[in-house]
């Protein structure tokens, strides 16, 4: 199914890294979907990082557990069965392989994504898993014992507002459904390229967790694996976090230690992706009465500025490169519209990548811009940040600021050209798959002076994420004192 937006701007309801740390090894760029060897260069304790199942905890002795809602505890078995039926199905064994050697291999493709709450009851535990990730709240090693208490505090106070957002888009995130559709579409596209493959979906913060997909990969006895994060650009907090889960597994699992693996780190530079984005933009521009007067407004998910300045996250550079490639493709088609890039979804008082989407929208209105086409460039699936944040909050702000004509490019979803390009990326990555290289990590967190690092990261993080709860937290304290 191809997920497109109708001329009226209504979304079809069916469509409802380079850097791994400053020290040690790193992932080299994949370029156009080549593979890499992964050098493990950060070490996170499992009880702070992975979303593991109770059976795994019992075996390992770990004290970490995933916060699950009662509803999900009851449906866990059903969840696993439905995922297996929808995604893990292999191709017909009679389909001709590219070569006799390939026919003997059992290829798997692991799609990595964020995950999202499927019901309102899922929202708080989903947020807990999100904020319990040390790549989201980056605390110094000495203070990581605060990770889970902070995650509990933040998720508890943020859940009511987040529930309002999810309620406004139907009561849950469509991300899992769309990702499963993309997995099935990729399976078909690979079959057309004479590649039989099992497709797996691993979500970072909700079902099906990456660990569940890993378990299934082992049961299926996959002999070669391609890891494909569904994030066009690499960031520590997205692809990086998901890949680190895989790192921890490799360190402890003899099966994966010897499994040839290819990791496609980022793929925003691929011609197929760039052209698919340009196709969607061109189509939406044609809906406006005066397409040449429309400003193209790229809105990307933001990250704290320190990720880039202190941790070396390549996200900003890759995002700017991505925009340049898309605009270059549009220019080759004679589309010369002006454009701008801004970053959305910031939280707390700390500085994030600028300019901020909400501030830019107000400025554009003040400058007299009348027609705007929003392009969610970080996302390949519709979810709360497109359906609620962009379609509702930012649209309302834009209209209030004087922008008269608003449009939004849909996420790529299951667009055939996009899925075909992902299939090409997988095929290109297979030949150089090799066992991941593990490396013992220096226990130090960075090269910064210890006191400087502790004061900057610890107190900054605590202050930022406590203030993040305002005004609800302040109000609660005030009521207690009174």
Curated annotation (Swiss-Prot):
PROSITE patterns: FERROCHELATASE. It comes from the Eukaryota. Keywords: Chloroplast, Heme biosynthesis, Iron, Lyase, Plastid, Porphyrin biosynthesis, Transit peptide. It catalyses: heme b + 2 H(+) = protoporphyrin IX + Fe(2+). The keyword Disulfide bond does not apply. GO terms for biological process: heme biosynthetic process. Pathway: Porphyrin-containing compound metabolism; protoheme biosynthesis; protoheme from protoporphyrin-IX: step 1/1. One of its GO terms (cellular component) is chloroplast. It is found in: Plastid, Chloroplast. Gene3D superfamilies: 3.40.50.1400. Pfam families: Ferrochelatase. Its EC number is 4.98.1.1. GO terms for molecular function: ferrochelatase activity. Belongs to the ferrochelatase family. Catalyzes the ferrous insertion into protoporphyrin IX. HAMAP family: Ferrochelatase (MF_00323). This is Ferrochelatase-1, chloroplastic. It comes from Oryza sativa subsp. japonica.
């Amino acid at each position: 199914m191809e997920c497109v937006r109708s001329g009226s701007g209504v979304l079809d309801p069916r469509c409802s890294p380079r850097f791994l740390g400053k020290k040690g090894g790193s992932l080299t760029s994949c370029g156009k979907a080549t593979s890499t060897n992964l050098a493990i260069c950060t070490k996170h304790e499992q009880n702070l990082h992975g979303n593991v199942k109770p059976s795994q905890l019992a075996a390992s002795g770990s004290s970490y557990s995933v916060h699950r809602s009662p509803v999900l505890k009851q449906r866990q078995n059903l969840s696993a069965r439905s995922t297996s039926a929808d995604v893990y199905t292999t191709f017909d064994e009679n389909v001709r392989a590219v070569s006799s050697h390939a026919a003997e291999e059992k290829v798997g493709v692991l799609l990595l994504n964020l995950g999202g709450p499927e019901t309102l009851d899922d929202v708080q535990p989903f947020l807990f898993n999100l904020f319990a990730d040390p790549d989201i709240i980056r605390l110094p090693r000495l203070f990581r014992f605060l990770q889970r208490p902070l995650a509990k505090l933040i998720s508890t106070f943020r859940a009511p507002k987040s529930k309002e957002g999810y309620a406004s888009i139907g009561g849950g995130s469509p991300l899992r459904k769309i990702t499963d559709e993309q997995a099935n579409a990729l399976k078909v596209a690979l079959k057309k390229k004479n590649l039989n493959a099992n497709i797996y979906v691993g979500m970072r913060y909700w079902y099906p967790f990456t660990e569940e997909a890993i378990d299934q990969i082992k049961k299926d006895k996959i002999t070669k694996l391609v890891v494909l994060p569904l994030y066009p650009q690499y960031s520590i907090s997205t692809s990086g976090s998901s890949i680190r889960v895989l790192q921890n597994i490799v360190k402890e699992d003899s099966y994966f230690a010897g499994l040839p693996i290819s990791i496609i780190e980022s793929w925003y530079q691929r011609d197929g992706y760039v052209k698919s984005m340009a196709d969607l933009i061109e189509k939406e521009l044609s809906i406006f009465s005066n397409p040449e007067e429309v400003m193209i407004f790229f809105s990307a998910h933001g990250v704290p500025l320190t990720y880039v300045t202190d941790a070396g996250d390549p996200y900003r550079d890759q995002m700017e490169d991505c925009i340049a490639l898309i605009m270059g493709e549009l220019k080759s088609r004679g589309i010369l519209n002006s454009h701008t890039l801004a970053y959305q979804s910031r939280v707390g008082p700390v500085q994030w990548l600028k300019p901020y989407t909400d501030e830019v929208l107000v400025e554009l209105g003040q400058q007299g811009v009348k027609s705007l086409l929003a392009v969610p460039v970080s996302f390949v699936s519709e979810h709360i940040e497109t359906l609620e944040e962009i379609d509702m909050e930012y649209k309302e702000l834009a209209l209030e600021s004087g922008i008269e004509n608003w449009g939004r490019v849909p996420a790529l979803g299951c667009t055939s050209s996009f899925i075909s390009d992902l299939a090409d990326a997988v095929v290109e990555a297979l030949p150089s798959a090799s066992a991941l290289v593990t490396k013992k990590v220096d226990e130090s967190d960075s090269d910064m002076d210890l006191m400087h690092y502790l004061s900057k990261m610890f107190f900054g993080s605590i202050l930022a994420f406590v203030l993040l709860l305002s005004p609800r937290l302040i109000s609660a304290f005030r009521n207690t004192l009174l």
